[in-house]
A protein has these predicted regions:
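Secreted glycan hydrolases and related glycan-binding modules that recognize and/or cleave
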Residues: 11-231
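Bacterial N-terminal signal peptides
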Residues: 1-9
């Protein structure tokens, strides 16, 4: 039985990016399970959202989201946290680590944590500082993944990108915004392909994608992750 067979349900049609051609997926809150999950070898599963401070105490909060803890036996699973702020308090870290332990205790092959945060280029150095601290809090056998914006390769200082290489195990560069493919995504790809750390390309299901020949030639390229959506 392949990874996520227990999540299999419903039918889906595809246009543009065909999820059936891939084996790594993001599974987000509110998205119905699709037949392609039966072929998944890697799943990135949303488990929470870290909200920016909105109340009088000025504290960020981790709001649980996503599916209930399943019992998956094969492949790789990453638990994902969508962050709207980097000002995390100790309660957030404790909750994250507790969720990680529960997923593993249920027998799921959790290999790491992914942070989904839209770090603008000029604040990327602050994001790296945050990730360095988070890395020290994770178990030694827990990898760290992040999502990345396409303009990092064009606008970020090389030394900042190099710092990322020493902190995260991979970056998944998103070619979409919201649920739509960025119209000029191809203009960013040459610099993305020159990243000097393991990277994947994130695609929106039903979006647009044409792979340039040079992408697969990068020794750092690790394939694709498809953001599943309801038809």
């Amino acid at each position: 039985m392949l990874l996520a067979l227990a999540l299999l349900a419903g039918n889906a049609s595809a246009a543009g990016v065909d999820a059936a051609e891939h084996d790594a997926f993001w599974l987000w809150s509110g998205v119905a399970a699709q037949p392609v999950l039966a072929q998944a070898r890697t799943l990135y599963v949303l488990q929470g959202q870290v909200s920016a401070p909105r109340y009088s105490d000025g504290r960020a909060r981790l709001i649980a989201q996503g599916i209930a803890i399943p019992r998956l036996k094969q492949g790789e699973v990453w638990v994902v946290y969508r962050a709207h702020t980097l000002h995390w308090n100790e309660d957030i870290y404790r909750t994250l680590l507790s969720q990680l332990r529960r997923w593993r205790a249920a027998g799921n092959p959790v290999v790491g944590v992914q942070i989904d945060f839209d770090a603008r280029t000029r604040y990327l150095h602050e994001y790296v500082d945050f990730l360095q601290d988070l890395r020290t809090r994770l178990p030694k056998d827990c990898k760290l993944s992040i999502t990345g914006l396409m303009d990092w390769g064009s606008n970020a200082a090389p030394e900042t990108i190099n710092r990322l290489a020493g902190v995260v195990d991979e970056v998944v560069v998103q070619t979409y915004q919201g649920r739509q493919t960025i119209p000029n995504y191809q203009a960013y790809l040459p610099r993305v392909a020159r990243l000097q750390l393991p990277f994947r390309i994130g695609l929106a299901q039903y979006g647009q994608w044409r792979a340039p020949d040079y992408l697969a030639k990068s020794r750092w390229f690790r394939g694709y992750v498809v953001f599943l959506q309801n038809p």
